[in-house]
């Protein structure tokens, strides 16, 4: 049989029990601080119970907001946010009009304590330009989140040497850093552009389709390499621009 030992507990109006501030409550062998089990649930629908370091409170914990950057700008921290998780890729490399495709951008991910930070500069890498059969496609440019993490763009087709697919970029500074996928070489008809962390490239071309691949080049995942064309008279698709995704945590 359990026993409840009380000392100077007083009841008011038959419903409210007041415990003196000097009295400690123990539950399951653990002391409950501030004589409080839970704050009032009134007005706290869909919120969780947690601690702000001083008191037990109701609040929205975990990831409670997201900011997405598809162009360069400034990240401004939302109220009450202490940590963020950032994922970003650079710009994908451009492709050739005849078989060779671009490399995908690198990827980086990092969890950052932002309790002492209010804003961070964000740079989004641009996709590389396409080329005709014999030229060199442009490389994608780098994305970055302040000085915390960055990711280089993918190489364009024919950058290393003629008829070579583009090499993937690489992330840096993150808790996770990855290469982007490489592009296809000459002779790989309908070869895909390099895949980024976020997905693949647009549809590939065909001589009877003319500029088909280039016309649909924006239907690609961020940071992916340009898909190859399949006819030397047409300009290859560009690489896809980068992206930065910021999850905010309280």
PLM features: what roles do these ranges have?
Residues 2-62:
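Extracellular repetitive beta-rich solenoid segments
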Residues 9, 184-190:
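Feature marking protein-protein/ligand interface regions
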Residues 26-30, 47, 121-127, 221-224:
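Short sequence segments immediately N-terminal to proteolytic processing junctions that release a mature
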Residues 37-43, 64-71, 165-170:
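Disulfide-bonded cysteine-rich modules in secreted/extracellular proteins
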Residues 43-47, 82-83, 241-242:
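Short, surface-exposed beta-edge/turn micro-motifs
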Residues 68, 74-78, 85-147, 226-245:
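Glycine-rich strand-loop-strand elements at beta-sheet edges
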Residues 122, 198, 202-204:
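Glycine-rich, flexible loop motifs
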Residues 128-176:
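Acidic, low-complexity glycine/serine/threonine-rich segments
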């Amino acid at each position: 049989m359990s026993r409840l030992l009380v000392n100077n507990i007083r009841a008011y109006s038959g419903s409210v029990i007041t415990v003196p501030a000097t009295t400690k409550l123990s539950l399951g062998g653990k002391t409950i601080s501030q004589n409080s089990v839970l704050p009032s649930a009134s007005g706290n629908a869909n919120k969780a119970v947690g601690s702000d370091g001083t008191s037990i409170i109701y609040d929205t914990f975990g990831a409670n907001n997201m900011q997405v950057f598809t162009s360069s700008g400034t990240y401004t921290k939302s109220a009450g946010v202490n940590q963020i998780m950032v994922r970003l890729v650079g710009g994908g490399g451009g492709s050739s009009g005849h078989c060779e495709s671009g490399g995908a951008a690198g990827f980086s991910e990092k969890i950052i304590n932002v309790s002492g930070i209010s804003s961070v500069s964000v740079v989004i890498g641009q996709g590389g330009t396409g080329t005709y059969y014999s030229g060199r496609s442009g490389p994608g440019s780098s994305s970055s989140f302040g000085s915390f993490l960055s990711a280089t763009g993918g190489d364009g087709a024919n950058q290393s040497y003629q008829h070579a697919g583009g090499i993937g970029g690489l992330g840096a500074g993150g808790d996770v850093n990855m290469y982007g996928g490489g592009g296809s070489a000459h002779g790989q008809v309908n070869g895909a552009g390099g895949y980024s962390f976020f997905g693949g490239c647009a549809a590939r071309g065909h001589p009877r389709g003319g500029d088909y691949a280039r016309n649909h080049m924006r239907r690609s995942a961020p940071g992916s390499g340009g898909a190859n064309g399949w006819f030397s008279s047409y300009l290859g698709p560009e690489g896809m621009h980068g992206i930065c995704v910021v999850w905010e945590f309280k």
